Amino acid sequence: MEYTNIGGVKIEKTAALAPMASVADRAYRIMAKEYGACYVVGEMASCKGLCYNDRKTAELLSVTPGERPMAVQLFGNEPEFVKGAVEIAERFQPDIIDINSGCPMPKIVSGGSGSALMKTPELFGNVVRAAVEAAHVPVTVKIRAGWDVNSINAVEIAKIAEQSGAAAVAVHGRTKTQLYAGKADWDVIRAVKQSVSIPVIGNGDVSTPELCREMYEYTGCDLVMVGRGSYGRPWLFRQICEYLETGSYSPEPTAGEKLDIMRRHIQLIVEDKGERVGMKEARRPASWYLKGMKGAAKFRDMCSELTTLDELERLIEKIKEQQGEHENEDL
């Protein structure tokens, strides 16, 4: 197995879980790790929120043993708040601290953070420098190709990140204005890799083991990061590990196996957030696991009414029975 070294943190060169706000929570990250993700990144936390002692913001930074190696991610555009937030984040003992300079969402960029930092290279450099000076662990940055098609400046921004002390740079191959539409431009990732000496993490449109290897080969990147391609498919990380090592990988789980995996995921959510909140938050991931099953729409509706793990267990058994009946009909 090959490894990538990020500021002294040794990471297997397979696939990492990308940071995804309101998606990649602790349960999601643990699922990814259990299925072979080499590295995970937490949900982004506001630097100002941390400095103002916001409890919910601080909760985003906690790290459990089953998630390591893990980066916590911060966003902000004021160096003094970034410095303070890094000092607070280090109390949670993350392996890496990541600075979000790629989020395209309006509520983030309207405040000058996220991908808006790519429009202000000097400020971006000051933010990264403030984080690096305050940190005792490696600092990485996550960027996009640029703001729009007329301002593709990922290479310039990556160079500034390196000069400012960043240990690695992750590049999503879309612009801010693309959001998540269209195709990720892997040429931008390759150009960044050819322009800096720190590790480059490629991100965008990796949804199969074959595409993961293709990104490695085409861009020359040091690590591949998977985001939306893992929705309801934590086993993708295992398949990627298998494919990179042997050239083949295990088949997709059966309907029954997917339901067992869904149960595990929802149990983790409930363990982390309690049954009342956890069962509500489980509706979204449940819909991903049920996708493609016969009667999926009906079962999604039924999942939205669940309030306890016992109810979930009964529903899973019911779905398994119906999937089994359909499988027998197909024979």
List the predicted regions and their residue ranges:
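Flavin-dependent oxidoreductase catalytic cores
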Residues: 1-331
